[in-house]
């Protein structure tokens, strides 16, 4: 199969705490668990005994998490509203975050994949959890939802893939072509990339439209790393949420549903580790 030049790495993002705003970096190691330092902490609801995200706790988007010493430390520093600075090793962080989201919660690091109960989904019965999940997609009457009948059993039983704080796969990709295409359809909206929480933004010079959707089933090569493009990324209500510097705006979600078949960006899994650097050429084969 011919190798195609797709563009270059424009931005690299990681989100040390699940659901919080993250940090932009110039270079980062990548392996089977995704970018080094990405989603290494998460908030866990004490009563539900369940990992939380900005889908269920949108208040998390008002916080920013940064790796300490360039991810050489397992601890992360956190900026909260009202100019509060804290950290994962600050005993007060659990109180701060509980007050922020309105529920008693604990900031937790990753645990081994064998600790299944830690990652388990809260279920009152066989249907309530699914209705809660559907509600996070913030659909209006008549708008389609993703096909939840195809959810694998693991996704039905666990909030994240055990051993990780990822919903599906550890890597999320979006292109400037897609953002520019959506901007052309809805120019009054602010298509700021932070709303979509990608790990990399690929700048495409000549490609136009929703180009990454055509990469599903193909392999991406960046420097020595290889990333398998595995699935589309259906969008939920998180993209509409208010966060630092971004106002609440539901118009983008309406446009994504109507014009992009509910999807923006794609997911990937890492088949060969390496190091990503801003400016790296991206190839697809």
Question: What kind of region is each of these model predictions?
Answer:
Residues 1-285:
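Metal-cofactor-dependent catalytic cores
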